[in-house]
Swiss-Prot record:
Function: Alters the structure of the nuclear envelope by interacting with host CBX5 and disrupting CBX5 association with LBR. Involved in the perinuclear-nuclear localization of the capsid protein VP1 during virion assembly and maturation. Plays an important role in the release of progeny virions from infected cells and in viral propagation, probably by acting as a viral ionic channel in the host plasma membrane. Allows influx of extracellular calcium ions in the host cell. May contribute to viral genome transcription and translation of viral late proteins.
Name of the protein in its database record: Agnoprotein
Claim: Ion transport is one of the keywords in the record: yes
Taxonomic lineage: Viruses, Monodnaviria, Shotokuvirae, Cossaviricota, Papovaviricetes
Organism: JC polyomavirus
Similarity section: Belongs to the polyomavirus agnoprotein family.
Modification type Phosphoserine: residues: 7, 11
Amino acid sequence: MVLRQLSRKASVKVSKTWSGTKKRAQRILIFLLEFLLDFCTGEDSVDGKKRQRHSGLTEQTYSALPEPKAT
């Protein structure tokens, strides 16, 4: 009986620490992806102007493409 209770407490503790580890790993992954995104949006080699910075992975806005000219 006591052994069963200790086993349950141990499994709860492991699951709590595992969920914390997963959250920490997700935060690190998001940080690295945002860092790479900022690194890759350097100067544009065509006109020498800096590209527009993104505010984050979840808040990207894209401008509409220009309408094709009628010929």
